């Protein structure tokens, strides 16, 4: 039932943000509190969270889900931010997107005393974004217990580039 509700709620925009991309817009989920609540409950029910010490949310839509999940599970929330958004000593990794490239950074102090993370984002496409964060964590001898996303774009094969469990609520 949740999958059907999500498919009816998530909107698709062809050729956005550039020609050839079919953009899946998850923002309408937030306009329906019942669906949003069921989505969060489904996400936090996954085994990957059981041994996690912290939730690592990816800029920017991952923050929307990661913050609620961290709150519900009483776990610290760590933010992976785009360039120029974090102060202090940072670890940064550049990655390729479905439609370009970017980089993400973590504050070194935010992960210093933690070892086991679940990464949360809105969508898994090519895997580049998630891989960049997992490489930062692995370089710091940290463990990624899994990835939790709302949407997975199966044709872009991002799951195959990751060496940890992936939990998707809906697959296109």
UniProtKB/Swiss-Prot annotation:
What molecular function does GO assign, one term?
A: AMP binding
Q: What is its main location?
A: cytoplasm
Q: Highest taxon of the source?
A: Bacteria
Record localization: Cytoplasm
Q: Name one GO cellular component term.
A: cytoplasm
- Please give the catalytic activity noted in the UniProt record: AMP + diphosphate = 5-phospho-alpha-D-ribose 1-diphosphate + adenine
Assigned keywords, A-Z: Cytoplasm, Glycosyltransferase, Purine salvage, Transferase
List the pathway annotation: Purine metabolism; AMP biosynthesis via salvage pathway; AMP from adenine: step 1/1
Q: Which InterPro entries does the entry link to?
A: Ade_phspho_trans, PRibTrfase_dom, PRTase-like, UPRTase/APRTase
Return the broad EC class.
transferase
Which CDD domains does the entry link to?
PRTases_typeI
Give all cystine bridges in this chain.
none
This chain's function reads: Catalyzes a salvage reaction resulting in the formation of AMP, that is energically less costly than de novo synthesis.
Question: Which NCBIfam families does the annotation name?
Answer: PRK02304.1-5
Q: Which family does it belong to?
A: Belongs to the purine/pyrimidine phosphoribosyltransferase family.
Stored HAMAP family = Aden_phosphoribosyltr
Per UniProt, subunit arrangement is:
Homodimer.
Spell out the protein name for this chain.
Adenine phosphoribosyltransferase
Q: Which organism is it from?
A: Prochlorococcus marinus (strain MIT 9301)
């Amino acid at each position: 039932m949740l999958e059907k509700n999500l498919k009816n709620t998530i909107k698709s925009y062809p050729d956005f943000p550039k020609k050839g991309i079919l953009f899946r817009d998850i923002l309408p989920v937030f306009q329906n509190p019942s669906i949003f609540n069921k989505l969060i409950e489904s996400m936090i029910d996954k085994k990957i969270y059981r041994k996690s010490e912290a939730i690592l949310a990816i800029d920017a839509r991952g923050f929307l889900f990661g913050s609620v999940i961290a709150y519900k599970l009483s776990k610290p929330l760590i933010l992976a931010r785009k360039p120029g958004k974090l102060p202090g000593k940072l670890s940064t990794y550049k990655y390729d997107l479905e439609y370009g490239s970017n980089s993400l950074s973590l504050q070194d102090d935010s992960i210093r005393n933690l070892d086991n993370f679940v990464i949360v984002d809105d969508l898994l496409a090519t895997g580049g974004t998630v891989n960049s964060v997992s490489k930062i964590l692995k370089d710091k001898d940290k463990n990624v217990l899994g990835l939790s996303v709302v949407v997975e774009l199966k044709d872009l094969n991002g799951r195959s580039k990751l060496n940890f469990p992936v939990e998707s609520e809906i697959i296109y």
